[in-house]
Curated annotation (Swiss-Prot):
<dbReference type="GO" id="GO:0031110">
    <property type="term" value="P:regulation of microtubule polymerization or depolymerization"/>
</dbReference>
<keyword id="KW-0132">Cell division</keyword>
<dbReference type="GO" id="GO:0000278">
    <property type="term" value="P:mitotic cell cycle"/>
</dbReference>
<feature type="region of interest" description="Binds microtubules and protein phosphatase PP1 subunit PPP1CA">
    <location>
        <begin position="131"/>
        <end position="254"/>
    </location>
</feature>
<dbReference type="GO" id="GO:0072686">
    <property type="term" value="C:mitotic spindle"/>
</dbReference>
<feature type="short sequence motif" description="Slightly degenerated SXLP motif; may mediate interaction with MAPRE1, targeting to microtubule plus ends, stabilization on kinetochores and is required for proper chromosome alignment to the metaphase plate">
    <location>
        <begin position="92"/>
        <end position="95"/>
    </location>
</feature>
<dbReference type="GO" id="GO:0072687">
    <property type="term" value="C:meiotic spindle"/>
</dbReference>
<dbReference type="GO" id="GO:0007056">
    <property type="term" value="P:spindle assembly involved in female meiosis"/>
</dbReference>
<keyword id="KW-0158">Chromosome</keyword>
<keyword id="KW-0175">Coiled coil</keyword>
<feature type="coiled-coil region">
    <location>
        <begin position="56"/>
        <end position="90"/>
    </location>
</feature>
<keyword id="KW-0963">Cytoplasm</keyword>
<dbReference type="GO" id="GO:0005874">
    <property type="term" value="C:microtubule"/>
</dbReference>
<keyword id="KW-0995">Kinetochore</keyword>
<dbReference type="GO" id="GO:0008017">
    <property type="term" value="F:microtubule binding"/>
</dbReference>
<keyword id="KW-0493">Microtubule</keyword>
<dbReference type="GO" id="GO:0005737">
    <property type="term" value="C:cytoplasm"/>
</dbReference>
Length: 254
């Protein structure tokens, strides 16, 4: 109780002291000699107040600018991380950049060599017609996105295109043997050639196809459940069709 009374007395005394100071300042303001000085001080206070308002607005602007710069830095950091991720995960099946032939300096033809070339000699054999081996096209990101989730499960875009790369390897290996003259074949290739012929049907005529035996012969792929899932996806993406018969499934490149 005594403590509260002392606090109240202290508070009242403080207020009385403030009133006395105000009254003394008021009396000073009535002095004609000080009115001009007080007026100037008032003008200075107004000017300082306006300056403080400008400082406050500038501080708000700087805070907004700082916030925008932080957001920009964060956005740039994320973009840099995305670029680094792309650099580190470039699909291996993408074509490599090569120098074009137009940039390669070709030496001027030697007139003497041209004269020699024009001299009649032994007739040359006509060049053998280059046979084109049809390869499977890689799937695009849009096509991969359209594959139902239940079908692709945890398979990635790159994993599917890696399988396509191996399938193309098997196709090229098979049809290089098919296009090779039989006289130059080894016994192993001759046996493979005969198997290729036996596997053909009227439905595969004029088309490039492989069977599981070709996958095992020319690649290191395992013909397992994952392989069949990917073949199902490739059929969904119209990269191949299946021709069955004689206990074989022929994967026709479309």
């Amino acid at each position: 109780m005594d403590s509260e009374l002392e606090d109240l007395c202290s508070y009242v005394n403080e207020k009385i002291g403030n009133i006395k100071k105000i009254l003394s300042i008021r009396n000073l303001g009535q002095d004609p000699a000080l009115k001009t000085t007080l007026s100037k001080i008032g003008d200075e206070i107004i000017a300082v107040n306006e300056l403080l308002n400008k400082f406050e607005l500038e501080i708000q602007y700087q805070e907004q600018t700082n916030s925008s710069l932080k957001e920009l830095c964060e956005s740039l950091r994320e973009e840099c991380e995305d670029v680094e991720h792309l650099k580190e995960h470039v699909p291996p099946h993408l074509p490599q950049v090569t120098a074009t032939q137009s940039l390669v300096h070709k030496p001027e033809p030697d007139p003497k060599e041209s004269d020699k070339a024009e001299e009649p000699g032994l007739p040359k054999k006509p060049p053998r017609e280059q046979r084109i081996i049809k390869e499977m096209q890689f799937i695009t990101m849009d096509e991969f996105s359209d594959v139902p989730a239940y079908m692709k499960s945890r398979l990635t875009y790159c994993q599917i295109n890696d399988i396509i790369k191996e399938i193309n390897k098997a196709v090229v290996s098979k049809y290089k043997i098919m296009h090779q003259p039989k006289a130059s074949m080894s016994s192993v290739k001759r046996n493979l050639y005969q198997r290729f012929i036996n596997e053909e049907t009227k439905d595969t005529k004029g088309h490039h196809f492989i069977v599981e035996a070709d996958i095992k012969e020319f690649t290191a792929l395992k013909v397992d459940k994952r392989f069949y899932v990917i073949m199902h996806i490739l059929r969904h993406c119209h990269r191949l069709s299946e021709v069955r018969g004689g206990g074989l499934t022929r994967y026709v490149i479309t």
